[in-house]
Amino acid sequence: MRASVDLSRLRAFLEELARAAREPTRLYLTGGASQLLRGLRESTLDIDLTFEPESDELLRSMVSLKEWQSVNVEIVSPVHFVPALPGWRDRCEFVMQIGKLAVLHFDPYTQALSKLERGHVRDMQDVQALVGERIVDPVRLRTLFAEARSELFRYPAIDPKSLSTAVDRLVGVDKA
């Protein structure tokens, strides 16, 4: 079992990973790691991330870093689970530059939709924190979701009605 990740461990991981970046790279943090950097959590079990462009050097470095620091690292993005919401790239928030590595929060609206779809207690707490800090506006999330709804066929595991209900509940409109 690997130890949970606090802010100092996350920063140390990112700084070491940046040493392997040989070209300008955008690293998108999502899930608990994003919440941790926002100050909305004190720890996370995993460092969930994705990067562009993909790099063999960074992938190799991540494997050795996760063993050396005894952390869980997952290459994952909310768009693996829900459709990318329109304009998602424009809503990714720059966090820091470490050498050639630009660290960003993945679009908080797509993150929130992914967490609503999963529906775990911790996910719902994360969504409430994003709303409470005014990072995500529930009405805007519903609008963006409506625009992306036609892409749900690409995600057979999603129950469109349940996801719509979860979004409506967040807005305060219970259609159940």
Where would I find each of the regions flagged by the language model?
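Compositionally biased terminal segments of proteins
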Residues: M1-A176
